[in-house]
UniProtKB/Swiss-Prot annotation:
Species of the source: Oceanobacillus iheyensis (strain DSM 14371 / CIP 107618 / JCM 11309 / KCTC 3954 / HTE831)
Descriptive protein name: Phosphoglucosamine mutase
Database matches in NCBIfam families: glmM, PRK10887.1
UniProt keyword terms in alphabetical order: Isomerase, Magnesium, Metal-binding, Phosphoprotein
Free-text comment on the cofactor: Binds 1 Mg(2+) ion per subunit.
Amino acid sequence: MGKFFGTDGVRGVANEGLTPELAFKLGRFGGYVLTKDSERPRILIGRDTRVSGHMLEGALLAGLLSIGAEVMRLGVISTPGVAYLTKATSAQAGVMISASHNPVEDNGIKFFGPDGFKLTDAQENEIESLMEGEDNLPRPTGADIGVVNDYFEGGQKYLSYLKDTIDNDFEGIHIAIDCANGATSSLATHLFADLEADIYSIGSSPDGLNINDGFGSTHPEKLQEFVVEKNADIGLAFDGDGDRLIAVDEKGNLVDGDKIMFICAKYMHEIGMLRKDTVVSTVMSNLGFYKALENIGLNSNKTSVGDRYVMEEMRQNGYNLGGEQSGHIIFLDYITTGDGMLSAIQLVNVMRETGKPLSELADEMVVFPQVLKNVRVMDKNQALSSSVLLDEVDAVEKELGEDGRVLVRPSGTEPLVRVMVEAKTKEECEQYADRIVSVIEQHLGA
């Protein structure tokens, strides 16, 4: 990670860390790096529903226009919508203004290349290098200054594409949706209405301040109650920018990203669409996920935590399904990033094709109890290479055998070591996690 770019673009508290001045620079230098080979580059901009979106869009727009770009404003749209439309309209770049599932105070700016994929590390480094130096970029004048046009119908083009990924309608299926008062608030309602589902919605009345506030994929409790109250067949919870999906079965039980991936992987395998019989996930996926795949003869590849690492593995090795327990699920045959609405219609389509309720599909994967504990340390990297810790982890893994697992990893942002244990019972998880935590605190703690 660089000075400005993190694991998912540039993020910060809007008007403090992520200021209009910084947004202008990102537009000017980011736009230049992505479009320097084009005489009149076309760049798409989308945003979520945060109150700071207009402010940052205006500043970003000014930066892009200052390098002579033709900017197409998409208005409120999901992150995957921007990624899809960037490629579909042959634009030179796309930009999304969102902080995903973060609170309303935060915002972010994320770029996509002409292929619809996020930027490479090399591209981000080039942008940062220009931002930290003297501004010697060309400054067009007169008719060469950039122009801006609205392309609000882009959202409908994106929805039409999503519908074309399946052959069924959803007539007679009762669907409850929670849009986190975010980017999918209008889009998801239109999508499922067009597919003839019976829709009930919550979290679909954004006011600029209520995004992710008690609703959406990181707060599914209200949706669980709503599904039972409305006697719905399925609940679908999206996050603020629409790149995640967490589902709820007809009984009100959570169906997380692991279960959604398993359900879709099994169906794709049965119809011959799962490439190399493999699903890509992160090390945080539940042990039950791996065992369920193994039981039906499928393989799994593990990556570090983060959807960018899942995507790298998929692209490098030709896989077409991957994701995270948190609900980032990538169907690479269709789109170049995680997409909550695409994941949702693929999941509902499996219900339609199999005739099975979601609870029955989800119950084929048995979730192992899991405990996650954080321990503050002096040096997290030194702690992870400590022989005393490695010996204790090895001892616990031998005792667990194939009925559990241990994962010890550093926090990405704090001086913490995270200890995750999965086992057959919650009591075993607690017992083994406490053993490892005790060793860290005694020998390596802050």
